[in-house]
Amino acid sequence: MMRLPWFEHRAPKSVQEAARILAGEGPNAMLIAGGTDLLPNMKRRQMAPKVLISLRHVSELKRNGSALGAGTTLTEIVNKKELPLGLRQAAHQVATVHLRNMGTIGGNLCLDTRCNYYNQNYEWRKAIDFCLKKDGEICWVATASKRCVAASSTDCAPALMALGARVKLVAASGEREVALEDLYNNDGIDYLKRRPDEILTEVSIPSGWNSTYWKLRRRGAFDFPVLGVGAAIRFSGDTVEEARIALGAVASRPFLVEKASEFLKGKKLTDEVIEEASRLVASRAKPMDNADLDLYWRKDVTAAFATHALRELRGDDMSEARLRIARQLV
């Protein structure tokens, strides 16, 4: 049986109280909201904080007005029909109902990167002399690399990135707001630009976008993404006024595919335009051999998933494909 390591549990009632505790405890502390990813990681000794600062009782993080509180659960997002469709689709494809009831949007955006050599129990990792991400000196995926190439595993980030979302980060010393795409580094270890003393408190989502999210995973019932495509378009009639396409799970960070987004501007979504845009999207996918399914196939299938996304935004009936791939029709 894998047991949790000993830790001290703190339960602040406000963001500022949580920020003060976080600043005071320094590297010994970690934040916990739903804990659906953190607690299993702790059982595998991938993380061993001495202090856990719970955000479950911080009511400020659950408010939803002009911005989405970081403590909003994924189930609540799925059920909020006024939220963008792409975000709701992404949230609905995370894990299972029970985990979505616990997991939060803030937690999903800050989700740890994943790798077949890292997401194993302690004894398994010890047998291979650990890895660069935790306790070792070698990246077993790219042995010549000095950078960890563990892959981003968040579903909601590509969907929100396509929507032009921004996030607020609060520390005891002050607060700042950044575009979501500026929250991430392309590094499997140092994957967040959020400072250790900062708390992600809310997500601001611009309006006026048509959006969608398509996810590839090994198990149809539930699994982490091995590819995520988030797409959003503003139309003027049937012409693309503005477009944003983001990829997830094919690098250590989710990222925008700017060439494809620029290519779509001012064009109608004809089959030929969709094919070329999808080719541009696929050209930016560079998955590593650190997740389920063959990496070359994952790269090749990126174009098909981008095509599904753009066809759905064009208004095509993609329900059959979505049921086959995503097992849902949100």
Where are these regions (language model features)?
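C-terminal structural segment of proteins
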Residues: 1-330
